[in-house]
A protein has these predicted regions:
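Generic detector of well-ordered alpha-helical segments enriched in charged/polar residues
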Residues: 49, 153-154, 174-178, 238-241, ...
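Solvent-exposed amphipathic alpha-helical surface segments
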Residues: 55, 85, 114, 250-261
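Catalytic core of nucleotide-sugar-dependent glycosyltransferases
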Residues: 146-147, 214-218, 223-260
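Membrane-interface aromatic/basic loop that binds lipid-linked glycans or pyrophosphate carriers
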Residues: 253-279
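Helix-centric, low-specificity signal for extended rod-like, repetitive segments
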Residues: 12, 96, 100, 236, ...
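Nucleotide-sugar donor-binding/catalytic module of glycosyltransferases
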Residues: 1-231
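Short linear sequence motifs
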Residues: 3, 68, 240-241, 262-265
Length: 279
């Protein structure tokens, strides 16, 4: 199985080297590493270019976005980029974490030996470096003493069993949903979308083994909250559209393609959310 790592960067010059090292030094080296920078104002792009050249890394590439997309759409674009490779398994990466050197090997072994699994997360360790860091809660699988735990079915978008940087997935899973993810659904987190869909389709599992260290600090994009109770009404409407409606439309269409009995349930949520946005 060929592999590709997708990494989103933004002003990560101070943090990125350890993550790059942990990917470069994998026991099973990735065939491709695609990095998209979202308009960094520090030396991130130059640092990565030098790193690739110095280490003579074939299949590694950094692309600088023409405009700032935001981390959600940056990952969406990376998923689209992955479709232009012949990789079989796609890994998601943040810019400031550290992978176990057997991460790629272990997740590929599971995916290659289990045809029923299309999305595979893993356990992670949290390293909190500042008081301002947001510490996400980890979902506890009831059967976590086993090697693998299946994602439960959750009909709502805001599901997160593990952080996105723990996820490996088969390319055909991306094929299921990427065509339905519109650019104006720009508040939809990629990791929540992937895990929710994998649960609904019953193709998502967690490898109950710690395979990465997830660093939490004040600069983590996922730790920032965009809309609050004090936000103007127009921002709440935009969130309803770009996050909730977006998720339910994608879920409905993916389930419909799969002839799932859950498609009509998600369709009702989709139509209800559309009415809320319109009113």
């Amino acid at each position: 199985m060929k592999t590709a790592v997708l990494m989103a960067t933004y002003n990560g010059e101070k943090f990125i080297e350890k993550q790059l090292d942990s990917i470069k030094n994998q026991v099973l080296a990735p065939d491709y590493v695609i990095i998209r920078d979202d308009g960094s104002t520090d030396g991130t792009v130059e640092f990565v270019k030098d790193y690739i050249a110095t280490n003579d890394l074939v299949g590694w590439n950094i692309i600088k976005n023409q405009k700032n997309l935001g981390w959600r759409l940056n990952f969406r674009q990376l998923l689209i980029d992955s479709q232009n490779t012949d990789a079989d398994v796609i890994f998601l990466s943040d810019q400031d974490d550290v992978w176990n050197l057997k991460k790629i090997k272990k997740q590929v072994e599971v995916l290659s030996s289990h045809s029923e699994i299309e999305v595979l997360s893993s356990d992670i360790e949290f390293n909190v470096s500042t008081d301002q860091a947001a510490i996400p809660k980890s979902y506890v699988f009831s059967d976590n003493a086993k090697e693998l735990s299946k994602f439960p079915i959750n009909r709502f978008y805001n599901v997160g069993f593990r952080q996105g940087m723990s996820i490996a997935m088969k390319k055909e899973f991306i094929d299921r949903f990427i065509k339905y993810w519109k650019e104006d659904y720009d508040l939809l987190p990629h990791d929540s979308l992937i895990q929710a869909l994998a649960g609904l389709l019953e193709v998502g599992y967690n490898l109950n083994e710690t395979l990465a260290i997830h660093n939490r600090h004040a600069m983590n994009a996922s730790g920032r909250h965009d809309v609050t109770l004090k936000s103007p009404k127009k921002f709440h409407i935009q969130e309803l559209y770009a996050k909730h409606q977006g998720y339910y439309e994608i879920a409905y269409k993916v389930l419909q393609d799969n002839n799932s009995s859950l498609a009509q349930v998600e369709k009702k949520y989709y139509e209800f959310t559309k009415r809320r946005v319109a009113n």
